[in-house]
Amino acid sequence: MKAKEIRDLTTSEIEEQIKSSKEELFNLRFQLATGQLEETARIRTVRKTIARLKTVAREREIEQGKANQ
């Protein structure tokens, strides 16, 4: 998911995406440990997506803080 797509989501949708991505990452790591994971690059892409989601969420937090001052 690209940053532009993430910025179009609402804050609650971003939180849901973070939650589902973390679950997916957990499952991918479990598959890696058991030797069932074929597409190992998927772990990296999910981690990057989580980072992008968290970055946009933090940007919104900072914007709200500035608006309240």
UniProtKB/Swiss-Prot annotation:
Key word Ribosomal protein present in the record?
yes
Q: Which InterPro entries does UniProt cross-reference here?
A: Ribosomal_protein_uL29, Ribosomal_uL29, Ribosomal_uL29_sf
Recite the UniProt keywords alphabetically: Ribonucleoprotein, Ribosomal protein
Determine the domain of life of the protein's source: Bacteria
Q: Name one GO cellular component term.
A: cytosolic large ribosomal subunit
Residue ranges of the TM segments: none
HAMAP family to which the protein is assigned, alphabetical: Ribosomal_uL29
Q: What protein does this entry describe?
A: Large ribosomal subunit protein uL29
